């Protein structure tokens, strides 16, 4: 057996020890601002590399999408099954102003709704709001037992499913096409669209757990900073009354005309 040097043990390390640098010294924090349709306005912070030369920190922030639980945005645990997507559109100082970018339901909520013996009905459609946002809305519904029903299952017929799906699409299109995006988001929070679908489909087949499962933004209009800032500024309350609207007292007299008469 040939005896030789073990190259691995005899070889020393090249160079000295590397300097341990803290990565966070090159980064800075920015505050995230939610639109006024939500109760919590400051919903978190985001990290970004500091401006170095021509590479601006704001360029890295614009377009970032943040997924936030609706329970955290509205301080309501009953809304914990919904997730809201907010995109960073404008930065002022250390504040990132966001806008609505999508909605979805958590996986565990969706799994809890699907049960044996009930028909699952889904519908989706592309809609356009008054402020030229193109959205794709997905709706989900489940059948429920009729009153005094003895049968354990409640499966809907294919013809009934088609009618319900058509009703879903019509209601979603009607509700979205006549409002602005901010007003449409306000409808998503209390599930007013789902309640309307449930009400109108009652004659076809009784429904339960009708939800807007997902909302995707397909196309957005050109960014208007003034409109974006309107979403983040609360309307000022009127501090004073209109003087012209107040009724004039009967005892009030014009001093100048009174002196001329005398």
UniProtKB/Swiss-Prot annotation:
GO terms under cellular component: cytosol; cytosolic small ribosomal subunit
Compartment(s) of residence: Cytoplasm
InterPro entries reported for this sequence: Ribosomal_eS1, Ribosomal_eS1_euk
Keywords, ordered alphabetically: Cytoplasm, Ribonucleoprotein, Ribosomal protein
GO MF entries: structural constituent of ribosome
Pfam families linked to this entry: Ribosomal_S3Ae
GO annotation (BP), single: translation
Subunit structure, as described in the record: Component of the small ribosomal subunit. Mature ribosomes consist of a small (40S) and a large (60S) subunit. The 40S subunit contains about 32 different proteins and 1 molecule of RNA (18S). The 60S subunit contains about 42 different proteins and 3 molecules of RNA (28S, 5.8S and 5S).
Family the entry assigns: Belongs to the eukaryotic ribosomal protein eS1 family.
PANTHER family to which the protein is assigned, alphabetical: 40S RIBOSOMAL PROTEIN S3A (PTHR11830)
Function: Component of the ribosome, a large ribonucleoprotein complex responsible for the synthesis of proteins in the cell. The small ribosomal subunit (SSU) binds messenger RNAs (mRNAs) and translates the encoded message by selecting cognate aminoacyl-transfer RNA (tRNA) molecules. The large subunit (LSU) contains the ribosomal catalytic site termed the peptidyl transferase center (PTC), which catalyzes the formation of peptide bonds, thereby polymerizing the amino acids delivered by tRNAs into a polypeptide chain.
Name of the protein this chain belongs to: Small ribosomal subunit protein eS1
Organism: Plasmodium falciparum (isolate 3D7)
């Amino acid at each position: 057996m040939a005896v030789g040097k073990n190259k691995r043990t005899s070889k020393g390390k090249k160079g000295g020890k590397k300097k341990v640098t803290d990565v966070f010294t090159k980064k800075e924090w920015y505050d995230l601002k939610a639109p006024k349709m939500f109760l919590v306005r400051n919903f978190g912070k985001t990290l970004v590399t500091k401006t170095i030369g021509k590479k601006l920190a704001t360029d890295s922030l614009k377009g970032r999408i943040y997924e936030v639980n609706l329970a955290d945005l509205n301080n309501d645990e009953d809304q914990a099954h919904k997730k809201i997507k907010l995109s960073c559109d404008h930065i002022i100082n250390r504040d990132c102003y966001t806008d609505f970018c999508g909605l979805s339901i958590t996986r565990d909520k969706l799994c809890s709704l699907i049960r044996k013996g009930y028909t699952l009905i889904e519908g989706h459609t592309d809609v356009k709001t008054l402020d030229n946002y193109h959205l794709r809305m997905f709706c989900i519904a489940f059948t429920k037992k009729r009153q005094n029903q003895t049968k354990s299952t409640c499966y809907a017929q294919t013809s009934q499913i088609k009618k319900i799906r058509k009703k879903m699409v019509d209601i979603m299109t009607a509700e979205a096409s006549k409002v602005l995006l901010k007003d449409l988001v306000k409808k998503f929070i209390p599930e007013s669209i789902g309640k309307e679908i449930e009400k109108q489909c009652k004659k076809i087949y009784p429904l339960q757990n009708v939800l807007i499962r997902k909302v995707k933004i397909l196309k957005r209009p050109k960014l208007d900073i003034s409109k974006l800032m309107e979403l983040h500024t609360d309307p000022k309350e009127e501090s004073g009354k209109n003087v012209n609207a107040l009724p004039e007292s009967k005892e009030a007299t014009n001093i100048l005309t009174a002196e001329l008469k005398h």
